[in-house]
Amino acid sequence: MIHQINKKILYISFFLMIILVTVHFTYYLSQIPSTTNQNNTFINTDGIVVLTGDKNRISEGINILKKNSNQRLLISGVNKKISNSAIKSLYANDTETRQLFNCCIDFDKISTNTFENSREAYFWARDRQLKTLLIVTSNYHIPRVKLEFSRFFQKDSLYYKSVKVAKNDKSDISIEMIRKIIFEYIKYLRTSLSFLVKI
């Protein structure tokens, strides 16, 4: 009898957990911004932080910087094995970008994850007395980025620019994109839990 009750409790607990995870996953998906019709009026922040990872993030950050060279750009999470000159060489035929590298672009080679990105961005902004930042990253990454950056920054000091990954934004459902979203959700879930318990 006791065994049957325990088994029933186990089934109910498992079922409730599935419901909770499903609801939370749906919430995560709802937090992924569209990359179309974005409001770009906030590009005049004091600084721009590009989180390395998917393609187009760095080029998007540089394009924003070109619109206002009074800003400063941090490329965060650069592989330690990649030299600054190697990155600059990618823009060898772009005179304007080469000039920006000489005056307005910094590299962070310490960060290896999103938490460290947020921490190093905080140190960078503090040292350069930057009050507002535009964070540039892939759209599916933004929900977790908001959580991690909230550890160091006030909400009203941060703005976000989501970079398109899939060809047709959310409507382009590919195996690779589904895999990325699932793995990113697992990280998002872990980060969410870390605000409740120390992990």
Please annotate each region the language model reported.
Residues 8-9, 58:
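Hydrophobic alpha-helical segments, especially transmembrane helices
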Residues 173-199:
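A transmembrane-helix-recognition feature enriched in membrane-embedded lipid enzymes
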Residues 1-7:
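N-terminal Lys/Arg-rich, disordered targeting/topogenic segments
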Residues 20-24, 165, 185:
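Aromatic-anchored segments of alpha-helical transmembrane domains
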Residues 30-175:
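A structural signal for short, hydrophobic/glycine-enriched beta-strand patches
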Residues 10-27:
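Hydrophobic membrane-insertion alpha-helices, especially the h-region
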